[in-house]
């Protein structure tokens, strides 16, 4: 869930005295508390060692692997009522130079569940185009422009209200804009990388793959909500 500033030590607390797992997020709130608005916020980079010391978090809510018309309808009914959705895609890894593949999984995270659409198994182009074009739903995804570019090779759409948390962080002076760095800095937890290069085109996705995919989309939504709560969206224009 998005962090509550009330649970973070006050600005007068010594940063050096905090537990290492709290330092990234505490730095953000302590600095923010000393300035009016976010223009004075100073963000620092986070090291691999600091990330390794953070608690691991994975998505623990409902995940629906959409395969049937009934599951599709359930997913779209939930997505249509959402204000902010996390979004990500997964692609089969290529290990040969010059070889590439198109996305084979699209993940949409709402406040209630994460929905996984297997693009190689069923044609979800109409549903995903509806979602991506919906002007009332903010789509939050790290490096989402790359995901959309690849999806357009599968079907046509005109995406609206697209936001990249990495771009928001960059506009506030942060150079580390990958999902795992952002989750560590702003949300205070570590997302494992384990299944990033697994076979997303496999006949069946295993539980670890499903959790990995759901976690990425969920974290993208959590980052947007965190930035919104912290007032970091003021200078960001939705696409």
Functional labels for PLM-detected ranges:
Residues 1, 8, 38-41:
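Short hydrophobic transmembrane-like helices used for membrane targeting/insertion
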Residues 29, 36-85, 165, 218, ...:
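N-terminal accessory regions of nucleic-acid-interacting proteins
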Residues 63-67, 80-84, 96-193, 197-212, ...:
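Conserved DEDDh/DEDDy metal-dependent 3′-5′ exonuclease domain
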Residues 84-92:
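Two-metal-ion RNase H-like nuclease active-site motif
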Residues 24:
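Cationic, low-complexity basic patches in intrinsically disordered or flexible, solvent-exposed regions
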């Amino acid at each position: 869930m998005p962090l509550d500033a009330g649970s973070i030590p006050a600005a007068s607390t010594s940063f050096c005295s905090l537990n290492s797992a709290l330092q990234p997020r505490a730095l953000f709130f302590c600095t923010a508390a000393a300035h009016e608005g976010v223009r004075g916020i100073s963000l620092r980079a986070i090291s691999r060692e600091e990330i390794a010391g953070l608690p691991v978090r994975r998505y623990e809510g409902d995940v629906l692997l959409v395969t049937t018309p009934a599951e599709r309808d359930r997913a779209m009914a939930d997505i249509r009522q959402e204000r902010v959705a996390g979004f990500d895609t997964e692609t089969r890894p290529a290990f040969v130079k010059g070889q590439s593949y198109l996305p084979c999984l699209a993940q949409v995270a709402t406040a209630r569940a994460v929905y996984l659409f297997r693009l190689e198994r069923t044609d979800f182009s109409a549903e995903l185009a509806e979602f991506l074009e919906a002007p009332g739903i903010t789509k939050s995804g790290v490096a989402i422009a790359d995901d959309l570019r690849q999806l357009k090779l599968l079907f046509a759409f005109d995406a609206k209200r697209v936001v990249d948390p990495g771009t928001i962080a960059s506009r506030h002076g942060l150079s580390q804009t990958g999902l795992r760095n952002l989750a560590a800095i702003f949300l205070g937890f570590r997302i494992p990388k384990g299944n990033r290069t697994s076979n997303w085109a496999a006949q069946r996705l295993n539980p670890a793959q499903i959790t990995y995919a759901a976690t990425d989309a969920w974290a993208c939504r959590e980052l947007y909500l965190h930035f919104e709560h912290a007032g970091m969206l003021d200078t960001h224009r939705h696409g």
